[in-house]
């Protein structure tokens, strides 16, 4: 509509209070809907439903994004779950690893980011799929994958035994920890990401932005498993 809107880091949904819609022994569904406050930062009416389904040692997270507006709706959605993990100063026999993909041989490609968390699309980085969790890994902030590099991420002990496994259908993912001594690392499946450092376009032109027709519903899912339990 030609108007400029501002938004906080990671969007507004995480700052809203969700309503519990339904609850069973193994499933919870929550929701939020657009209101006057969201319209100040995001010019669409919508409903967002988030479900959690527990089965054994796995939890599946489901997203339903519903366009309740009278026009096409553009959006991004992603997750930011954190898991306890320890980092070492350098790669060694006591170093945990991140496994990227089903086959951890080879490499994957990701974007570097600027100090203000913008993607440098002309400055990519190639990293091993068996990625040591060392103190300098996030010295340049988050690691942001390029398209369809993996649909599975895992945290593994030094002997290679995985203790957290995430499977997802999102096209890109992020890896992040705030400091070298933080006791956790985030595995983040995304539909959408930060803008490129030189991006000046519209919402419709953003990389990885999703579009919903009037009345349309978008479904997303990811699963977290604890294979050692």
Please state what every model-predicted region is:
Residues 2-6, 63, 210-227:
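Short Pro-Gly-centered flexible turn/kink motifs
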Residues 5-10, 15-22, 127-207:
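Acidic/His-leaning functional-site neighborhoods
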Residues 49-51, 207-212:
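Beta-strand-rich interaction surfaces with strong enrichment in secreted/lumenal proteins
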Residues 72, 82-168:
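Active-site/ligand-binding surface loops and adjacent short beta/alpha elements
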């Amino acid at each position: 509509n030609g108007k400029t809107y501002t938004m906080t880091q990671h969007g507004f949904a995480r700052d809203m209070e969700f309503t519990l819609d339904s609850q069973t022994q193994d499933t919870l569904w929550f929701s939020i809907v657009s209101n006057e406050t969201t319209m100040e930062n995001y010019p669409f009416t919508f409903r967002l439903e988030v479900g959690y389904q527990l089965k054994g040692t796995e939890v599946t997270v489901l997203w339903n994004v519903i366009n309740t507006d009278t026009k096409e709706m553009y959006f991004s959605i992603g997750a930011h779950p954190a898991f306890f993990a320890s980092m070492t100063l350098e790669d060694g026999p006591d170093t945990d690893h991140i496994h990227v993909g089903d086959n951890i041989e080879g490499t994957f490609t990701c974007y570097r980011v600027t100090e203000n968390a913008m993607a440098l699309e002309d400055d990519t980085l190639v990293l091993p799929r068996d990625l040591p969790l060392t103190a300098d890994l996030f010295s340049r902030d988050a690691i942001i994958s390029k398209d369809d590099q993996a649909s599975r991420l895992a945290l593994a002990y030094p002997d290679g035994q995985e203790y957290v496994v995430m499977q997802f259908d999102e096209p890109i993912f992020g890896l992040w920890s705030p400091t070298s001594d933080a006791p956790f690392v985030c595995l983040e499946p995304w539909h959408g990401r930060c803008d490129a450092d030189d991006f000046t376009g519209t919402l419709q032109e953003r990389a990885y932005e999703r579009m919903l027709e009037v009345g349309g519903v978008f479904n997303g899912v990811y699963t977290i498993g604890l294979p050692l339990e």
